[in-house]
Design a protein with these regions (language model features):
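C-terminus-biased signal that marks the final domain/tail of proteins
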Residues: 107-109, 116-117, 126, 149-306
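Catalytic cofactor-binding cores of redox enzymes
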Residues: 101-140
Length: 306
């Protein structure tokens, strides 16, 4: 991202009553599952894992188009879309079966810095099943399957797959595209994710995946005025869905830390917890002990709260 998105980590318990919008005609639900999430600007959920091992990650996609002319369906704010998935579903297939009904429309206000909220969502579960969800011309496009292991940014996913097929023919051991463009990073990640050790041992798997993520990250502080959609990587997360551990690494701190979901009380009585990241505090190892009682952040919707 082109600036610090002021991320913090929150723990949400089960039983929270939510609405997808702050006026009438909103999607409403009560969270079935607790989750550990990372925010963007503290106005929305952009990444996280729930207690069932479902992971959801929201990334920039400038080609996104959410609007349909004359659309009167109930409203889901893009700021809370990721949280809706984490709150309600245990598996990718379960989520896809509901989301493909397209029973709501996405409300996508501009972000605090004025950027458009053009985003797409990836979800994975502990079986390895994955879905990439993109709104194109007002309609939801879904790619579901274990073969979809990488998502970056532009272009739209079907175009990414076509570009990757071209590079598969060349072969990654001979040459890989090396720029910071998201399509090149997609190709490199697609090659390396199959080249690293394929093991259930988290002590090997987690650092192996992190090594791929570091390889395809955009260096901190890079500026490309002629390519405004290329921006620095701000942080990386890895979700160990088998052992229910959420790892987090900020480019501004020297340490990897994690939250072991098995040690967290997600019952409704436990309340909301927060791990502040914007105050310069450095964490290392299991940071469950550093969680503090907290109010929730306020999700951003198109209509300001009066």
């Amino acid at each position: 991202w082109k600036e610090d998105i002021m991320s913090n980590i929150y723990v949400f318990p089960r039983g929270i009553q939510r609405a997808g919008y702050n006026k009438e005609n909103a999607v409403k639900w009560t969270s079935k599952y607790g989750s550990v999430i990372a925010t963007g600007y503290d106005i929305g959920t952009c990444d996280g894992m729930n207690e069932k091992g479902l992971v959801a990650s929201l990334l920039f996609l400038p080609e996104s188009v959410f609007d349909r002319q004359g659309d009167t369906r109930p409203v889901m704010g893009i700021s809370i879309w990721t949280q809706y998935v984490l709150d309600n579903f245990a598996t990718v297939h379960e989520a896809v079966e509901e989301l493909k009904k397209e029973s709501f429309r996405i409300d996508a206000p501009h972000m605090p810095n004025g950027s458009a909220s053009t985003l797409h969502l990836a979800i994975t579960d502990e079986t390895g099943n994955t879905a990439v969800l993109e709104y194109l011309d007002g309609n939801l496009s879904i790619h579901e399957g274990k073969e979809f292991q990488v998502m970056t940014n532009s272009p739209r996913y079907d175009y990414q797959l076509a570009i990757n097929d071209y590079w598969k023919e060349i072969g990654g051991l001979q040459m890989l595209p090396g720029t910071n463009r998201s399509s090149d990073r997609f190709v490199r990640a697609s090659f390396y994710i199959h080249a690293i050790p394929q093991t259930p041992d988290a002590k090997i798997a987690v650092p192996s995946v992190l090594s791929v993520m570091r390889n395809v990250s955009v260096p901190f502080g890079i500026t490309t005025p002629d390519k405004p959609h290329i921006s620095s990587t701000r942080w990386r997360s890895v979700s160990d869905q088998k052992n229910k551990i959420y790892y987090f690494e900020s480019v501004m701190t020297p340490n990897l830390f994690w939250l072991d979901l098995k040690k967290i009380d997600f019952s409704p009585k436990a309340g909301i917890k927060k791990l502040p990241l914007t105050n310069g505090k450095i964490y290392a190892g299991d940071a469950v002990k550093d969680l503090k009682d907290s109010d929730s952040f306020v999700f951003l919707f198109q209509t300001p709260v009066m």
